[in-house]
Design a protein with these regions (language model features):
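Active-site loop/oxyanion-hole signature of alpha/beta-hydrolase fold enzymes
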Residues: 1-38
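Acidic beta-to-alpha connecting loop that harbors the catalytic carboxylate
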Residues: 165-167
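Flexible "cap/lid" loop of the alpha/beta hydrolase fold
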Residues: 52, 59-90, 134
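Residue in the alpha/beta-hydrolase core beta-strand immediately N-terminal to the catalytic nucleophile
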Residues: 36, 59-62, 153
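Gly/Ala-rich beta-loop-alpha elbow adjacent to hydrolase catalytic centers
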Residues: 39-43, 47
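Short beta-strand/loop motif that positions the catalytic acidic residue
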Residues: 155, 161-163
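Active-site nucleophile elbow and catalytic-triad environment of alpha/beta-hydrolase enzymes
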Residues: 85-88, 134-151, 157
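Conserved alpha/beta-hydrolase catalytic His-Asp/Glu region
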Residues: 93-137
Length: 167
């Protein structure tokens, strides 16, 4: 991650574009010609990449709590970034506590935070597919991503961007 943050983007093992290609591969495997794509955070970045590189596969795009990759917009608050860069605990209970803490930082202060529901969802995520190295690869993919703003200006499908000032 340090080399990527230093500007060497060649070291990323699994890029957002790779994940976008995997998304299209899933559509192919399911025999889905095109789809409405909705992505949250990194999922929004992946959906943007699909819309850029495989436009005919995208009926509409919803990018939620995400960014274009531009260093001028959509940057995480320092306390959120610091928490996201910490290695997650490997045990389930520690990971659930960590995940609840991250989601609490991401939640808008103007709305109630449902800790019990968040704890349940983070636990289900851990049970389904926890891989600490995967988390690091995802953070590296985001850090290595280039600014998609110029390419996104060419996207011609109905698009909605949902973001808040207190996220």
């Amino acid at each position: 991650l340090a080399s990527i943050l230093g500007g060497d983007r060649s070291t990323v093992a699994y890029s957002l574009e790779d994940m976008a290609r995997d998304t299209v591969g899933l559509l192919d495997a399911l025999a889905i010609e095109s789809a409405h794509l909705v992505g949250l955070s990194m999922g929004g970045m992946i959906a943007q990449c699909v819309a850029i590189h495989d436009a005919p596969r995208v009926r509409s795009l919803a990018s939620i709590m995400s960014t274009t990759g531009s260093p001028r917009v959509g940057q995480a608050k320092p306390e959120v970034l610091a928490e996201l860069l910490k290695p997650p605990p490997p045990d389930r209970d520690g990971y659930v506590d960590y995940g609840v803490g991250v989601w609490r930082l991401l939640a808008s202060p103007g709305f109630p935070f449902d800790e019990a529901k968040t704890r349940e969802l983070v636990g289900r995520s851990y049970d389904r597919s926890f891989d600490p190295k995967g988390v690091a690869r995802q953070i590296a993919a985001i850090a290595a991503a280039r600014d998609r703003t110029p390419a996104l200006a060419e996207v011609r499908v109905p698009t909605v961007v949902i973001h808040g000032t207190d996220d």
